[in-house]
Every structure is written in structure tokens, then in C-alpha cells.
Amino acid sequence: MRLALAAVLVLALAGCGSDETGNDAASTTPPATVTVTETETVSAEPEVTCSTAGLRLTLPEQELPAEVADVRKRVFDAAVACDYDTLEEIALEQGAGFTFTYGGETDASDYWARLEEEGTQKPMRALATILTLPYTRNESGSYAWPTAYSERPTDEAWQALVDAGLYTQEQIDQMKTAGSYLGWRTAITADGDWQFFVAGD
């Protein structure tokens, strides 16, 4: 009889111990985590597309002095990238005197950026394109592009501008009537000084 009572007491105590363990486990269960995501609306700035975007040009090798070839390549790469600041740095490497407009503007990079943004003219596309065309020598002996920029441009020189997509035949005819090429042109001296990139007169 005593053995039976002892067994009942042991089972009762064991049952109490298991309830406490369950309560302890329940009390230590971490609370559920709630994540709240906030969405911030940012107004996007209008994107200005460079006129060379999508333009596939290869700069052909030309028989030029090393200094001229180097500057030509650097100018071409910067023009394709619409890197106005680098272009201005190249323009001023050998001092002031670089011509980029016949107006009153004083900052070349700002001027080119404004023209690109307005979209009425495409100076970077023009610069990259004319540097892929044959060159000529201007009155000061500098290496100049395109060949239409000469005293007596040939029909082939005029046609090259149309084929390159820089000007329409009507625009070329107007320049011929005016007596000279007044489009975008550029020149580099024999010692590698980038002299100008300009249009008009």
C-alpha cells in the first residue's frame, strides 16, 4: 500500500514539473517582428541625351604627326562621351586663345553643354564626325577637319559632309552659294595645340 502511494506522489510531482517547463518555454518565446517599408518619392531630373548617343564611329588612322594624332584621338574620345570639361582642358593645355564661338560666351564647356541641351545644334556629334573625315592644311599650316574647310573645296569634300549626315544637300548648296564652308570645323597645330572648334563666321 505504501509503495502504491509513493508511486502516485512521484507521478504527481513529475506532472507539476512538466507544466512549469511548458510555462517557462511559452514565456520565453520572442514576439513576432513586423517590418514596415516606407516608399520615398524622388522627383527625377530631366535627362539630357548626348547627340553622340547611338552614334557608331571609328576613328581611322591618318598620316599625322604624333602630337596631332594624340590630340585628335583625345578630342574624339571626349566628344563621343560628351565630356565637355575634358574638351575644355585639352583646349587650354597650351594656353588661352582657343576659339569656340564668335559670340560673347567665355566658357567653352558651358557653351557646348547648352547647345546640346537645346538640341538645335549638335556640336559633339559634329566634332566626332568631322574628325573621322580626311583632313586638310589651313592657311597657318595646321591640320584641319573637314577638307571642305579650304579655299577651294572639291565636290568630294562637300559630298562627304552629306554622306556623314552632318548637313543636308540644301545646306551644302547654301554654303556653296555663300562661297565658303561655314559649318563646324576644327584644327590642331603641328605641335599638338588644339586651336578651335567653331561654326559660322
Identify the residue ranges that each predicted region occupies.
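Bacterial N-terminal signal peptides that target proteins for export
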Residues: 1-4
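C-terminal-biased regions
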Residues: 17-29, 46-73, 88-201
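Serine/threonine-rich low-complexity intrinsically disordered regions
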Residues: 30-44
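C-terminal motif of bacterial Sec signal peptides marking the signal peptidase cleavage site
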Residues: 12-15
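Short helix-adjacent coil turns
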Residues: 75-87
